[in-house]
Every structure is written in C-alpha cells, then in structure tokens.
Amino acid sequence: MKNLIGCVLCGGQSIRMGTDKGLISVEDTPWAKLSANKMEELNIPVVFSVNQNQLSNYKALFPTEQCITDHNINVEGPLKGLLSIHQEYPTLDILMMACDMIDMDKLTLSHLINIYQTEPNHDYYVYKHQDLIEPFCGIYTSGVLKNVMESIDNESFQDFSFQHILAIGNTKTIIITDNAPFKNYNKVSDIGY
C-alpha cells in the first residue's frame, strides 16, 4: 500500500507479563512477528517500535532498518513509539498494532483499511467497543501526527493519552462486531496455550 506503513508496538515495559511480550513465541514465532505477518499479508511494509533496552534482542530477529527506537520526544508510553515511527516516516500514514494482538485477523484489518481508503477525510481510523476506543489497531494519518508533534514541541499539549487524542481529533470509529481479534495478553494467566 503506497502511503501506509505498519508499526508493531513492542516498546512497553510488559511488567504484568514479566517478560518482553513481543519476544514470547507461539510455535517458534515471536508475537511481534505474528502481528507483523498480519499486516504483511495485506502488502503493508512493517517496522517495530522498540525501546533502546530491547534493540539488540529485536535486531537478532529482524533487519536493523525495521527496528525503530524511541526518539527524544517529550512524551512517554505508546504515543512516543508512534511518534518516533512518524519521525522516521513523516509522509506515511501508520497502521499501528500492539505486539500482543496476536488474535487480530485479516478480515478486521482489511475492513479498517477499506474504510481508510474510502473515507479519506479523517485523522484517525480506530475500532470502538461500546464507549471504549481501541487505539492499538488503528490508522494514524501523517498530517495529524505532524500536528501532534508540533503541539508537544510548543508545550501546548498536556494530555498524551490515546483516548484524549482520539476524542479531540477527527476520528472515524468503527464498531467492533467480533471481540476476539482485540484480545490482548497482559499476564501469563491470559495465555491459553
């Protein structure tokens, strides 16, 4: 896809899991790769957002150019990872997935991409379950990410949560009809294999 790059967010602390979630394997395939495969099946190039402490482990599994470390941005958490990818690819829109969304399916991703392509006037494209927006399977456009970066640089931005950013933006929400693809795994007890 011409103007879209996939990003697998792997840079979290994984405190509740007790280990780097992106490196947990299912049948010898790390979760980060499982998530990437889902986007690559749709011909979307993929990069991995990692923190500096993870870089050597990820470079052992993936090409160096696909491993993007957090940039020096005055924000923390997943937004830092997303904006670091944006700084590397400032003209591309980003399809972002968390590394633990291993149940995400091609149909759900294809539906998101179809809406992104047919309704191009939005800043963000995300799924929604009742009143809760699911930010970690969403498309974030380059123009609005540039604006978010400028707001951070100008210190005019105070709430860095995805829920806030999506609430104030021109966000296209898509109602979730099947919860299974959105399961994420936060604790060892969540893993059923």
Residue ranges and their predicted role:
Residues 141, 187:
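Short, conserved phosphate/pyrophosphate- and ester-handling motifs at nucleotide-, phospho-/glycolipid
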Residues 184:
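PAPS-dependent sulfotransferase catalytic core
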Residues 147, 189-193:
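RNase H-like, Mg2+-dependent phosphodiesterase core
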Residues 2-135, 142-147, 153-159, 164-181:
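Nucleotide and nucleotide-moiety/phosphate-recognizing core
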